[in-house]
Design a protein with these regions (language model features):
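Conserved acidic catalytic loop of the alpha/beta-hydrolase fold
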Residues: 1-11
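Short beta-strand immediately N-terminal to the catalytic nucleophile in serine-hydrolase-like folds
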Residues: 13-15, 40, 145
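Gly/Ala-rich beta-loop-alpha elbow adjacent to hydrolase catalytic centers
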Residues: 15-19, 23
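Flexible "cap/lid" loop of the alpha/beta hydrolase fold
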Residues: 37-69
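Alpha/beta-hydrolase
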Residues: 57-60, 67-134
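Short beta-strand/loop motif that positions the catalytic acidic residue
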Residues: 138, 144-146, 150
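Conserved alpha/beta-hydrolase "acid-adjacent" motif
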Residues: 151-157
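Catalytic active-site module of serine/aspartate enzymes centered on a nucleophile-bearing elbow/loop
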Residues: 168-204
Length: 204
């Protein structure tokens, strides 16, 4: 209904991390208007290997989370980056780029205040534990992009997708983690541009 009201005839669907299941379901339900599916470090099956502490975020009060984040911020951008990115090489890629550093800082704070997100956050955790998607029903061109050092969403999720979708391919970014859009943004953009360009051409 939204696409109809906006008079948009076709789309590329992008699903990142926990947004992957929604994008996948859209591609399955509306193949006639989906030019391509982009699965970006996305969940495609049950999320059993969760990172330590992820679920406890929703248990923190707004003040507690603000205090933790503020201490990290006062300690400097280096601390904020190392808090989420374990690989020193990736940390350096972010720190030497002021634009990416500022974007990273904004992303760091994006889950606060948790009180506005708590209900949805906990609902996601519950649903992702027993996630079951009919991946074999995806018929549109599909690309799965994933870093091989992602400890938040294991690369096995993208491998699962690419193994079950006939018209698909997987693009693995070496040395990249779940925050690779800050450290490997150029490589990611190039892979996305190529996928979209190729599938726009093929539709004519």
């Amino acid at each position: 209904a939204l696409l109809d009201s906006l008079e948009i005839e076709s789309v590329f669907v992008f699903g990142s991390s926990g947004g992957g299941p929604s994008a996948i379901e859209f591609a399955i339900l509306y193949p006639e208007i989906t030019k391509g599916l982009i699965s970006y470090e996305a969940l495609t099956k049950s999320w059993v290997n969760r990172p330590d502490g992820a679920e406890s975020l929703s248990k923190q009060s707004d003040f507690q989370l603000w205090y933790i984040f503020k201490i990290a911020e006062l300690m400097g951008i280096e601390t904020m980056v190392s808090f989420l990115m374990p690989n020193p090489i990736n940390q350096e890629k972010v720190l030497i780029n002021e634009t990416q550093s500022n974007k990273f800082k904004d992303n760091f704070w994006s889950i606060w205040p948790m009180s506005l997100r708590k209900e949805g956050y906990e609902n996601d955790f519950k649903n992702y534990l027993n996630l079951s998607l009919s991946l074999e029903k995806i018929s549109v061109p599909t690309i799965a992009i994933h870093g091989d050092e992602d400890i938040n969403v294991n690369i096995s999720h993208s491998k699962e997708l690419s193994s079950k979708v006939k018209n698909s391919k997987i693009y693995v970014i070496k040395g990249a983690d779940h925050f690779m859009h800050f450290s490997h943004n150029k490589e990611i953009k190039e892979s996305l541009d190529t996928f979209i360009r190729d599938n726009v051409k093929s539709s004519y």
